[in-house]
Amino acid sequence: DAGRYLIPDLPDADYELWVRGYGLADSAKTAARPGDRLDLRAIVAPDAATAAQVYPAAYWYSMLDLPSEAELEPINYLMWIKNMGCIGCHQLGQLSTRTLPAAFSGFESSHEAWIRRMQSGQAGTNMVGIAAGQLLGLPYKYLSDWTDRVAAGELPSSQPERPSGLARNVVLTVRDWSTPEAYLHDLSGTDRRDPTVNGYGKLYGSPELSTDIFPILDPQNNTSSSFFAPVRDADTPSTFEDPVVMPSAYWGDERIWNSKANSHNPMLDATGRVWFTARIRADQNPDWCMEGSTHPSAQVFPTSRSGRQLAVYEPDSGEYTFVDTCFGTHHLQFAEDENNTLWTSGGGPVVGWLNTRLFDETGDAEVAIGW
């Protein structure tokens, strides 16, 4: 009734606390430690523009105009903006995306600045390929219009509501794990068939193109660790070879990505082992995948290349086992069958699977996979 509140289970550390809320301006930061009693005062935002600075990114992203029906006709715009491109990697609407960095301020128009911005870093080739190739340059048009309107003072048309009732008791913890140069594509902490597996346990991340230092987070004990994911063959290519197309506004000419494993997804099995879609070798498939092989799947549909394979990590021992595949892998999912079949996507013209029971018995991927 006195308006006091408790932040529970904080690790013993030094903290900075301040008040942030919808309709408020951030208060001054105050140093504190667990056990301290503080009197933090909220500051009502002096205007709508100040209040909007802490709105969720989606409120700002909603201001982005959509192309016309005629512009959309030849392309799959939303798929590439949302699922396959921009939204998949960037939180469109947060401060650094709804504004243009000072490094790109020397252009005559924001349209030119966005063209230059998307050439930045080791991802520049891919970003330009999507924006200028797949989407025929439309993102440049609408992103530049969006940032122009934001720069001119336009604000989101709706405002988030302040929490009420039990929602005021929700405590959210946002954790930085891995390194500033890396990113996480995905993480897993359980077997989706039985979510009690690894209960209250560690979370395992897949850093994809960025690094081979795979992060591990223990949210119960507030600790993070990592392990190095090796590859089987020395000639496995690395993303470090990907050039910096143009200097980044944040990293300059530095090549911050350096991954051979290029792990896309993790998934735990019933025993708590972590299976990764991860590269273990160069693209060229072994002979038993190709035409002339006696492998049953190769006799039906031989394959010559595989851009990513499989690996399994044993948390207790730290053992990392390679699983070669004749098909590319992307996402993975266990079946509810006696073989604990691990199905994968990303195989292009084929769908691949691994009989994990047979692989555990033999250690031989050639006899345990099919497609």
Protein language model features and the residues they cover:
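The canonical Cys-X-X-Cys-His
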Residues: 83-94
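Beta-propeller fold detector
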Residues: 117, 158-175, 224-248, 321-325, ...
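Extracellular beta-sheet/turn segments enriched in Thr/Pro/Gly and aliphatic residues
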Residues: 32-54
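A short, solvent-exposed loop/turn motif at the edges and junctions
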Residues: 14-33
